[in-house]
Regions:
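RNase H-like, metal-dependent nuclease domains and their acidic two-metal-ion catalytic environment used
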Residues: 1-154, 194, 198, 210-313
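Short alpha-helix plus adjacent loop in nuclease-associated cores
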Residues: 145-218
Length: 313
C-alpha cells in the first residue's frame, strides 16, 4: 500500500496510472552469458534511444550521506509525435563499493542493455570516477567476449548539461585514446535540481513516463504462465527484483516533501527515507528532455527542407 506525505510534491496517481510495462530488462547472470542465452530486450527499435543512469556511492566516501546508496537505472526512449516517451525498464540498488567494481557493473549494464548514453553524477567519487570510466576495463569472466574500451564525454553541446568548460576538462582527462563518446556527466546544483523536479512532475502528469507493473502483478503473471514452477529461487528473485525496485521508487517519490525558497524547489526525504532513486529518475528525464529538443529541431528542419523542395518544384 502506497502512502503520500501530506505536502508531497508528486501525486501517486500519476505513477499508478502509468505502471503499464509488463516486461523488465533482466541483466544476464554469468551462467546466462556462458550458456549464450539471448540478451533481455535484445530487439531495439530503429529510433529507440537507451540510457543507463547512475548515482554512485563509494566505500569510504565521507561526502555522502549515511543513507545514500548506489542506484542504476535503465531507461528507453520511444519517439511519440513530438517527444520521447520514457520507459523505466530496470532499477538496481546496492551499497557503496570500490570504484573499480562499481564502474565494472556500470559498463556491464551499458553493453548488456545496448545503451547509447551513460548518465552519471560526477560529484560522486570526484574526478576519480571519470578516470575509472575513461580507461580500459578488463572483465574477470567474459574475456575476449567483452569490449574493454574506455568511455569519454559526448562532444555535443545540445546534450551536455554541465558547463562546456567542464566537458573539455573531462575530455582532456580521458585515459583511453580510443574511448567511446557516450558519457553525460551531471553535477547537481540548486537550480538544476529545481528544474529537474519541475520537468519530472510535468512529464508524470502528462503520462509521458511509463513504469513496470507492480511486483505483485509480476509475481501473479509468473505463476499464471507456469514460468514460476521452472525457476530456481535465484532466478525468481532476479525476475521480480526490477518490479519491486519500481514499487520502492514510486514510494520514495511520493514521500518527498517540497520546500519553496527564492523561486526554487527543494525536495526533502523523510528522516529515515531515501531520495536516490528519485534523483536518478530526474537526471534521466533531464537528458531525455535534451533529446526531445534535439529531435524536434531535426524534424522541424526536415519539414522546412521538404517545404522548400515543394516550392521549388
Amino acid at each position: 500500500m502506497f502512502s503520500e506525505s501530506e505536502d508531497a510534491f508528486f501525486d501517486y496517481k500519476s505513477f499508478k496510472e502509468n505502471q503499464v510495462l509488463e516486461k523488465a530488462f533482466i541483466p544476464p547472470t554469468p551462467q546466462d552469458f556462458f550458456m549464450d542465452k539471448p540478451l533481455s530486450m535484445a530487439n531495439k527499435d530503429p529510433f529507440e534511444i537507451r540510457l543507463v543512469i547512475a548515482d554512485l556511492a563509494f566505500t569510504g566516501d565521507s561526502g555522502r550521506e549515511k543513507n545514500d546508496h548506489t542506484v542504476f537505472m535503465c531507461m528507453s526512449l520511444h519517439w511519440k509525435k513530438f517527444r520521447f516517451e520514457r520507459h523505466l525498464d530496470y532499477i538496481e540498488t546496492r551499497p557503496g563499493g570500490g570504484a573499480d567494481k562499481v564502474v565494472l557493473r556500470l559498463k556491464e549494464l551499458f553493453w548488456d542493455y545496448q545503451a547509447d548514453y551513460l548518465v552519471f553524477d560526477n560529484r560522486s567519487g570526484g574526478e576519480a570516477i571519470y578516470d575509472f570510466l575513461s580507461k580500459e576495463t578488463e572483465h574477470p569472466e567474459r574475456g575476449n567476449a567483452w569490449n574493454p574500451c574506455g568511455f569519454t564525454v559526448v562532444q555535443d553541446k545540445d546534450l551536455q548539461i554541465v558547463p562546456w568548460g567542464k566537458i573539455e576538462e573531462l575530455s582532456n582527462r580521458t585515459v583511453d585514446p580510443n574511448a567511446m563518446p557516450c558519457l553525460i556527466p551531471i553535477i547537481g546544483t540548486g537550480d538544476l535540481n529545481s528544474l529537474g523536479w519541475q520537468s519530472l512532475k510535468k512529464n508524470l502528469e502528462t503520462n509521458n513516463i511509463k513504469f513496470l507493473v507492480p511486483m505483485q502483478e509480476a509475481k501473479d503473471c509468473l505463476v499464471d504462465s507456469g514460468d514460476y514452477f521452472k525457476m530456481t529461487s535465484d532466478e525468481y528473485a532476479q525476475a521480480v527484483m526490477p518490479y519491486g525496485q519500481t514499487d520502492e521508487t514510486i514510494q520514495e517519490c511520493v514521500n518527498l516533501s517540497a520546500e519553496y525558497k527564492e523561486g526554487k524547489i527543494r525536495l526533502k526525504e523523510p528522516r529515515s527515507g531515501y531520495k536516490d532513486r528519485a534523483v536518478v529518475l530526474s537526471y534521466g528525464n533531464l537528458v531525455a528532455e535534451r533529446l526531445d529538443n534535439r529531435y524536434a529541431k531535426a524534424n522541424q528542419k526536415q519539414e522546412c527542407d521538404l517545404e522548400n523542395i515543394q516550392l521549388v518544384w
